């Protein structure tokens, strides 16, 4: 079963829609970005929509103090680290805050993402694979070569495998059908002019659910 995360939430109406559509995770970006929110805003946003999907906080090379500040205001369910955080730091974060840690790894740069996984095994709950961009940590809207996904999935072993980068309603079916992605992470793919677009979100969710239903029906007949 594929789970869906919509990242870069800044507005109450968007969060309320994601709750209504039963999206699996919502992402709040605390790193410098056009989608950035501060700790207080995030806390107010989550409080405004009781029963919202589990919130994932996205950070790039944070300090422990920065994480503490955010968590004192916003009830996050997952900490996603999208920078050059070491395995040791990830373990410290997991132990200190008693929350799952997701580690983002870039695909397409000089570093071998599949090789990097090994040093984080047993520490993080999931690996997120996003397209390498020297000037931006995620949210680029660029798709990496999906032919690499099977090798990345194999390297993840027991950890969840999250695919991000350039995903939208027109290609999510291919991603789910050919590669059985565990978690799909979408941000710019449901935006218009940099703002979350309700219709694009609805269309994406419909495509994901339709593909899941088709897969379930096929499995039941097999």
From Swiss-Prot:
EC numbers: 5.3.1.24
Pathway: Amino-acid biosynthesis; L-tryptophan biosynthesis; L-tryptophan from chorismate: step 3/5
InterPro entries, A to Z: Aldolase_TIM, PRAI_dom, RibuloseP-bd_barrel, TrpF_fam
Pfam families: PRAI (PF00697)
Highest rank taxon of the organism: Bacteria
Keywords per UniProt: Amino-acid biosynthesis, Aromatic amino acid biosynthesis, Isomerase, Tryptophan biosynthesis
Gene Ontology annotations of biological process type: L-tryptophan biosynthetic process
Gene3D superfamilies named among the record's database cross-references: Aldolase class I (3.20.20.70)
An example molecular function term from Gene Ontology annotations: phosphoribosylanthranilate isomerase activity
The keyword Endoplasmic reticulum is assigned to this record: no
Catalytic activity line of the entry: N-(5-phospho-beta-D-ribosyl)anthranilate = 1-(2-carboxyphenylamino)-1-deoxy-D-ribulose 5-phosphate
HAMAP family noted in UniProt: PRAI
Family, as annotated: Belongs to the TrpF family.
Name recorded for this polypeptide: N-(5'-phosphoribosyl)anthranilate isomerase
Species, as recorded: Brevibacillus brevis (strain 47 / JCM 6285 / NBRC 100599)
Organism classification: Bacteria, Bacillati, Bacillota, Bacilli, Bacillales
